[in-house]
């Protein structure tokens, strides 16, 4: 079972995403409202993926860069109610792997995560030759 951490200042959003992931077969090992606490959960549980609200990604703590440097296999999904092209490009450049749009639709969230994982596996296989 793949492990996940959720970081979002909105408790309702955290709860909904927790339900979607849990019912989708993921083990949510922690959730919090702040990026620094999210990083502590990452250090403790070593999840396969972390879902972070846009606000936590942009809070000035360089959290994406820290995760990519120290946990390069952890997939980062940005969660936001509105993702414009500039935000999307900036997030991809920083190392975000995928995007989850609010309001959540369970099937769309799970499909996004699955397709990102499959694309990463395919890319790794192609690089391995």
Feature-to-residue mapping (PLM):
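Two-component/phosphorelay signaling modules centered on CheY-like receiver
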Residues: 11-30
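Conserved phosphotransfer cores of two-component systems
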Residues: 43-45, 67-73, 94
